[in-house]
Design a protein with these regions (language model features):
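The feature encodes the CheY-like receiver
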Residues: 57, 66, 75, 87
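Short hydrophobic/Thr-rich beta-strand motif most characteristic of the beta2 strand and flanking loop
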Residues: 26-33, 41
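Active-site beta3 strand of CheY-like receiver
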Residues: 45-51, 56
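Charged docking surfaces used in two-component/phosphorelay signaling
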Residues: 16-24
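Conserved acidic carboxylate
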Residues: 9
Length: 123
């Protein structure tokens, strides 16, 4: 069974990099480019995991995470935050709002994302 991942990312370049990496593992990737469409896609498609950027053009990733975790129909879906923000307080905020992991976008971002997905049993 192929797992479905929802990526909420406004950078086309970053989304393509992640898409290419996850395709190597046979994962189905849905992409939303802003917070509102990411929230709607989560409710509509019920992905196995949401990979969520923090800095989005409308709702930020923290607000999207809070909305998912406050909706009893989708609160069970794990959320991994993948973001440029790498300060300790950002990581703490991400985990406090319900993310299961918080990954900075650096040279190891895709590799760390794959490892996080392994830990969740998606790979």
């Amino acid at each position: 069974m192929s797992h479905q991942i929802l990526l909420v990312e406004d950078s086309r370049t970053q989304a393509l990099r992640i898409q290419l990496e996850l395709a190597r593992y046979g994962l189905k990737l849905l992409i939303a480019s802003d917070g509102n469409s990411g929230l709607e896609a989560t409710r509509t498609h019920r992905p196995d995991v949401v990979v969520l950027d923090v800095d989005l053009p409308d709702l930020d990733g923290y607000a999207v995470c809070r909305a998912i975790k406050s909706d009893p129909t989708i609160e069970h879906i794990p959320i991994i935050m993948l973001t440029q923000r790498d300060a300790a307080h950002d990581t703490i905020t991400g985990l406090q709002v319900g993310a299961v992991d918080y990954i900075p976008k650096d040279s190891l971002a895709e590799e760390n994302l794959v490892e996080a997905l392994r830990q969740l049993g998606v790979l």
